[in-house]
Amino acid sequence: MLLTTYGTEYDAVVKTMHLYIDGCKQGNSRVMRPAFHENAGFFGYAGPDLAIGTSFLFDWVDKNGPSPHIRPRFVSVDILETIAAVRLEVDGWSGSLAGPSVCMSDIFTLLKTPDGWRIIQKAFHWHS
């Protein structure tokens, strides 16, 4: 991939990721839904329970409510033509379900579609 193409694609991937981040900050799944492909996968443990499916994520975000002070950090963004992998660390989660301060480690896989970059998979670890 040419460096100029990589820079353009990097910006587009990060823009998609910010839809997810903004939805988390606002506690509003409608903000983040456009970032996800309609058939996206979602897996991880929320405490001792295995969480599966984007419907779990969207419901959780809406029920948790706003978490305006989260601190997201892109650990890595790897892009290969039409696929991307993003590792995201998010500190400072708060809200009715998260509690006072929780850290999340996320690994996302994105696919470049005709409509832009979309999250096709999210796996997470909740640090308690």
Question: Where do the language-model regions lie?
Answer:
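Short, low-complexity N-terminal intrinsically disordered segments enriched in polar/charged residues
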Residues: 1-30, 34-38
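Short beta-strand segments enriched in hydrophobic/aromatic residues
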Residues: 36, 90-92, 123-126
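Short, hydrophobic secondary-structure boundary micro-motifs
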Residues: 33, 43-45, 120-121
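Surface-exposed, charged secondary-structure patches
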Residues: 5, 12, 41-100
